[in-house]
């Protein structure tokens, strides 16, 4: 089986569907991974790291692959050959046109954002992990924007009261 990892095209998207570590694990299972050149740049993974993990890099991750894994659905569904599978956050309940075009192109799609948030599916639950990271980042951004110390600080020279916030 060949898995393709495309470069994300959505504006501001910095995530990548597979890390070099996950790529290495797939390779040990006999799965060949093709990573589009620059796909990991936004997440600070170089092409060399993917190659060291056993992946090959190419100008496109859509050519001659059985499965495409992406964070979001590719903009150009026509890049996917009939019989290819796509695993991404497709938002099928919102983007009916995308679902229709995937079906018309003969692409089997797995919408990762519709996997139930239950214990049995926890290892595939992308929404909980992304929400957790987004919440953490929001607190960091808020702390930076506040311009005052978050924790209470006690020193010989005095005490700085903790910041108060609402999440």
Model-derived segments and spans:
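An N-terminal-biased, well-structured beta-alpha scaffold segment characteristic
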Residues: 1, 5-101, 105
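Glycine/serine-rich phosphate-binding loop and adjoining beta1-alpha1 elements at the start
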Residues: 2, 76-164
